[in-house]
Amino acid sequence: MKRKTKQIIITSIYLAVAIGSCYLVYKVFFGPSCHDGRQNGMEKGIDCGGSCPQQCLNGPELKNLQLGSVSVIEYKERFDVALEVTNINGQFGFGEVAYEVALYSGEEKVGRREGKIYLLPNETRYLIETGIECQAFPDKAKVYIQSGEWQEFTKEERPKLEILNKSFGYKKVAGNFFEVNLQVANRSSYDFLTVDIDAVVKDKSGKVLAVSKANLNSVKSGEVRDFRFFWPEAFEGQAQLVEIKAQSNVFDLKNLYSK
């Protein structure tokens, strides 16, 4: 074999090895992967779906939470805020959603409160914050959803919490202007460490007059528990309707256990 031909063959081999090495380095360090923070390769989302083991939970089939109109109520020289929050997704909910309630006088923020809420699939519940101090009299409030992770609902059973024997009325005695009496029945097969109860008082037009929230601890399966809401000082308007909603966070495994 001629010397020149041999040099060409050797050079070709070196080039092939170099090109192969570069391609391998690119595939390992720069090519599409399930950890590069980009939607590429066979992925259906960013580092999820398709060739990646992680499922895409934030796909287009999931809808954002729907926020209703915000009610601001002055009570005892402070301010309460209430609105309905709806999750219209059928299989996914939130074990925890962080939010901020901001109260404004004109464009100036004069009060705020941060909190957390949970929502099951296809659920509407109240978001309530009470006793917010403000630097000036607010004329509006806004609620900002800050963070939260979708969780697939895999429980066999939703909470079955029933409100029984609800009654309400004006007492107009010292320390008790208005009260609501009720019973909470746990028809679920689970015992709950905590059951959350929301109360919203409205007039005949549907305007929110007063709100409150509370919780019951250690509510056993099959148990019926008495409870009372009361407002020690007067609020404006004539109460005609009281909405009571009870719920418990089944996304939190520490909150429930079966019989």
Question: Model regions: which residues?
Answer:
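A cross-kingdom feature marking solvent-exposed beta-strand/loop segments within repeated
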Residues: 66-71, 78-87, 93-98, 102-131, ...
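Surface-exposed interaction/gating patches
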Residues: 77-92, 148-211
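Exposed beta-strand and adjacent loop surfaces of beta-rich binding modules
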Residues: 96-100, 140, 194-198, 241
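Cysteine-rich modules of extracellular adhesion/ECM and protease-associated proteins
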Residues: 6-60
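Proline-enriched interdomain boundary motifs that mark the N-terminal boundary
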Residues: 62-68, 162-166
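Short, recurring structural edge motifs at helix starts
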Residues: 33-39, 70-71, 86-89, 186
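Terminal connector regions
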Residues: 117-118, 131-172, 210-211, 228-259
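Proline/serine/threonine-rich low-complexity linkers at boundaries of modular beta-sandwich domains
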Residues: 29, 55-63, 152-160
